[in-house]
């Protein structure tokens, strides 16, 4: 008996987002079609005003399209009310932003626990999973520290641990390296490479070619449209430092930075 076909993580069908009206009408997105399969690694590039941030907000269920259809892991988002959308967003998407969005007077491990608390996970299980996520990003020894006691790179790792703690189907990152130095940027990209090598779907919004170079697929946007969509080097053609094992080793070696 044939196995059922798995639905894509992201399916956008003629998604448009309009602001204003009449002479002031702005098409932030204009009939965008996009499919992202499980295990893909996609970078979205474009100048300011190209529509990439609006696209991220709709994929992340932070905004609703003016028209079109959006399925997230097979779930038709337009059929959900606000409460249901929030639950799906918390369970299926891990967000990583340029600003780390950590609660200042809350420890690293408690910050990571937050999505699990919203999902109703019991405290003991929350703590176990949060510590495991911090270990996955190489910063378990800082679990009891406040954000003010961590470097920028360490704070970003805490934010990444929080993003993966619910085991989401999609990691969605918006300019994740914007507040990092070059060393922390390299470590963050090594984490993304490792996550994707382990089968996790990653979508990154960026204007930096060096960040996009880590993806398997690069989209370019202009005036609310996807104007190019191309595959890059196959995984077997990539440098060996991009493998999952090598990425984990790199993070482990630099975990005290």
What residue spans do the PLM features occupy?
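ABC family nucleotide-binding domain
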Residues: 7-215, 220-221, 226
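ABC-family P-loop ATPase nucleotide-binding domain
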Residues: 1-18, 231-257
């Amino acid at each position: 008996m044939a196995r059922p076909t798995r639905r894509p993580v992201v399916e956008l069908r003629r998604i448009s987002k309009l602001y204003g009206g009449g002479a002031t009408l702005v098409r932030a997105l204009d009939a965008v079609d996009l499919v992202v399969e499980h295990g893909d690694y996609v970078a979205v590039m474009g100048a300011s005003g190209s529509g990439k941030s609006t696209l991220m907000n709709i994929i992340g269920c932070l905004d609703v399209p003016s028209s079109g259809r959006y399925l997230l892991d097979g779930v038709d988002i337009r059929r959900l009310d606000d409460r249901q959308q929030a639950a799906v967003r918390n369970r299926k998407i891990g967000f990583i932003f340029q600003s780390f969005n950590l609660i200042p007077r809350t420890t690293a491990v408690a910050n990571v626990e937050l999505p699990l608390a919203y999902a109703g996970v019991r405290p003991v299980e929350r703590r176990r999973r949060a510590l495991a996520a911090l270990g996955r990003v190489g910063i378990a020894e800082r679990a009891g520290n406040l954000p003010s006691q961590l470097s920028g790179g360490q704070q970003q790792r805490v934010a990444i641990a929080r993003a993966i703690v619910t085991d989401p189907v999609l990691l969605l990152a918006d300019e994740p390296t914007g507040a990092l130095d070059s060393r922390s940027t390299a470590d963050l990209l090594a984490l993304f490479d490792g996550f994707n090598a382990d089968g996790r779907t990653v979508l990154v919004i960026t204007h930096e070619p060096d960040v996009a170079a880590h993806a398997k697929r690069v989209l370019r946007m202009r005036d609310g449209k996807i104007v190019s969509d191309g595959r890059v080097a196959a995984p077997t053609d990539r440098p060996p430092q991009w493998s999952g094992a090598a990425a984990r080793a790199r993070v482990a070696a630099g975990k005290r930075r």
